[in-house]
Regions:
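Conserved class I S-adenosyl-L-methionine
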Residues: 1-40
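Short helix-loop-beta connector
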Residues: 40-46
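Local beta-strand N-terminus motif with an aromatic residue
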Residues: 44, 105-106
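Class I SAM-dependent methyltransferase SAM/SAH-binding core
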Residues: 48-98
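A conserved beta-strand element that flanks and buttresses the S-adenosyl-L-methionine
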Residues: 109
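Short catalytic micro-motifs in class I SAM-dependent methyltransferases
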Residues: 112-113
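A short glycine-rich, Lys/Arg-flanked "PGG" loop and its adjoining helix->strand segment in the class I
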Residues: 121-134
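Conserved beta-strand signature within the Rossmann-like core of class I S-adenosyl-L-methionine
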Residues: 135-143
Length: 145
């Protein structure tokens, strides 16, 4: 029995607008996460959303007046296409851990991403050691239904 690559599944979801349900399904959790971390950040702050999908969290972060830069990364080509179509910002198509940002970030946000990795602990080490600014914050959510 073979398993399908998650990026292929999410590209299919984007094509049939199922990505919109991701926002409605995760908004409550993401809002709680952001309510915790935003007050902890220096001003202005930079942020990256790892597994950004259609970019809805990036758009939410851009709405904070003290947010100076937002980057999104996702492995689904169709999700990145939607992110670019729906908003302004910097979006990258790549699977991880094979991509590295050109700068470090004050906030690393991730929702429903880590369990798709073969080595999530290794990715967390990379995020902390290579992507996160000193005194930065990483927050990752995994919904449990």
């Amino acid at each position: 029995m073979s398993t399908r690559d998650a990026t292929d599944v999410f590209s299919e979801w984007a094509l049939i607008d199922r990505d919109e349900g991701m926002e409605s399904g995760h908004a409550k959790s993401v809002n709680e996460m952001l309510n915790i971390v935003i007050p902890m950040l220096k001003k202005p702050f930079s942020a990256i959303d790892v597994g950004c999908g259609n970019g809805w969290v990036c758009r939410k972060l851009q709405a904070y007046e003290n947010c100076s830069k937002v980057v999104g990364i996702d492995g689904s080509s169709e999700m990145i296409a939607k992110a670019k179509q729906k908003g302004t910002g910097e979006f990258h198509l790549s699977t991880l851990p094979g991509w590295k940002p050109s700068q470090k970030f004050d906030l690393i946000h991730s929702m429903e991403f880590l369990y798709y990795l073969k080595e999530p602990l290794e990715m967390l080490k990379i995020l902390f050691n290579e992507w996160l600014e000193d005194q930065g914050v990483l927050i990752a959510g995994v919904d449990h239904y």
